[in-house]
Amino acid sequence: MSPQGLTAQTDRFQNQYQSGYFLLEGRHAEKKEDEIQTIYLDTGRFAEWDKGFDFYAPQTFIDQKGRRILIGWAGMPDAEYTNKETLQEGWQHCLTFPRELILKENPYSGEPQIYQKPIDEIMKLRTGKCIPITQKTTQFENECMDLLFIGLPESFVIEIADGVRIVYQDQKVALSLTEECGSGRTIRKTTIPVIETVRILVDSSILEIYLNDGEMVFTTRYYKKAPGTLLRIDYENVRGLAYPLQAITVNDKTRNRTV
């Protein structure tokens, strides 16, 4: 659901509008949709799909493999920040990468929650060999990357494109963008007790950041000035993997064309 009017808190509901879900239990979970008349829900149990700047009005469906897939709108209506760089090219928003939704117990809280992970088909977009990330500064030629970091310390900084920073310290994670890179986007932050893995899908103007295999996700548009993908790491014993990605190809059989 995508409610409007939730009061912003220190680490929740920081966007103009929110998107998220409630986990229903007992008799409500067992009823069919047309049997449910009125349910009173506590907003304290409302779980946001995404903690970043640009995520709204997601849709889900069941695919041929029986997976529940979510695709979100990477944009935020009535936000203070803009997409002036793409507006100059005649377009503004885009869609997120399809995410598989998995309901399971959070090992840190012991509570059930929905995890999100990029669908496995992303592996078909990987080109060339896997590139180990062992240096604190790495420049990739490719605009689109699939980055994975493991063995993370209790505090760390990951910076992309000279302007997007992911900072984790004292169980607080923050995503911040400079004015030049963020086009008005500033900072989004929240609490997470442990971060063991960080996966980042890098496209030319959108980042999707998955923490702990999808326990928490941040999505943001960004606008870099230099080609390729610049990566800076601020912690010791860097361990990561990088996969260059090619574009998604869509076969339009109705018009006999590929886009």
What is the predicted role of each segment?
Residues 1-35:
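Internal metal/ion-chelating core segments
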